[in-house]
């Protein structure tokens, strides 16, 4: 096996010369002589043919070549480097197989981390980096959440249009493997629209709703209704379906599905998964009103058999959305607490009343402790006078 060429210890001119010779030897249409127009032109020529090393080279060898190109690229001033960086990023998306895609991912990650944090080019590198990460199933290695994403661009925030484009890509690369993360991305995307341009976000809004409904771990759907692009969907079937998941019970969904079966299926939603989610949401809503529920009530409200009640409640408890206790002997479920499906004015008033009651109870306790303390001091003084 041929040794891996390493050019990093050479001067820029020498690296360029060696790279030209290397690619020409591989059969690329490139001169082995340096350009008289400077390093930028050399890089353009080298990047233009660099994919030839994907044909027969070993991953470690290719990584060394790409590392050399990156080491030259990061020396180019920002005002002259944009086209070079974009051309390189585009080449990295052309890896013919997964092992080489991982090499390209490492190269782009190396470039991303070596660019100045205030460089606007980091956005373009990251966008292509996500594309390559999808090719080799490494998305979660480069994207773990919206907060992490924003922190990476804190010194040079991309434009709203750029972030919208990136959020759409992130949704696309996570929707099949991490619905919860994908749903959060879409909500963040819709949050980038204003009242002036929300009307053009129809497709994004529909994707956001569908992703949230399909996610088995997303139950608090009420915040979606306040997003401006979602408001523009009022009157559409997708908005009606969302409203059912926000505040209605299982029978409403069953009726909707019977009336609009083709629509639900066309959105890529799974009816059985929808039923499972609506049963849980219905149980949560019942738990808000009834501290105690019989098995008979649950079989009727949830449209399940009596032998399915206990397994269902156990699954609900695993979500930690509801705290409850099964009473098999009396065929009842005792509710301790539940998360509210919606959190509007009534819930805020309830929370206010609860906090006010706590405040009054604490005041009573403090007053009682003060009285006890005073009584003990008086008793101590009296006993001292007696003795």
Swiss-Prot record:
**Keyword Cytoplasm listed:** yes
* Superkingdom classification of source: Eukaryota
Kindly list the GO molecular function terms attached to this UniProt entry. Answer: translation initiation factor activity
Query: One GO biological process from the UniProt record?
Result: formation of cytoplasmic translation initiation complex
Task: Give the keywords, sorted.
Answer: Cytoplasm, Golgi apparatus, Initiation factor, Protein biosynthesis
Question: Keyword Coiled coil: yes or no?
Answer: no
Subcellular localization is given as: Cytoplasm; Golgi apparatus
What SUPFAM superfamilies has UniProt attached to this entry?
A: ARM repeat, Winged helix' DNA-binding domain
Any matching Pfam family:
PCI
Give the record's GO CC terms: eukaryotic 43S preinitiation complex; eukaryotic 48S preinitiation complex; eukaryotic translation initiation factor 3 complex, eIF3m; Golgi apparatus
The UniProt record lists the PCI domain at 181-340
Family stated for the protein in its record? Belongs to the eIF-3 subunit M family.
Its biological purpose: Component of the eukaryotic translation initiation factor 3 (eIF-3) complex, which is involved in protein synthesis of a specialized repertoire of mRNAs and, together with other initiation factors, stimulates binding of mRNA and methionyl-tRNAi to the 40S ribosome. The eIF-3 complex specifically targets and initiates translation of a subset of mRNAs involved in cell proliferation.
Subunit structure and binding partners: Component of the eukaryotic translation initiation factor 3 (eIF-3) complex. The eIF-3 complex interacts with pix.
Its name, as the record gives it, is: Eukaryotic translation initiation factor 3 subunit M
Q: Which gene produces this protein?
A: Tango7
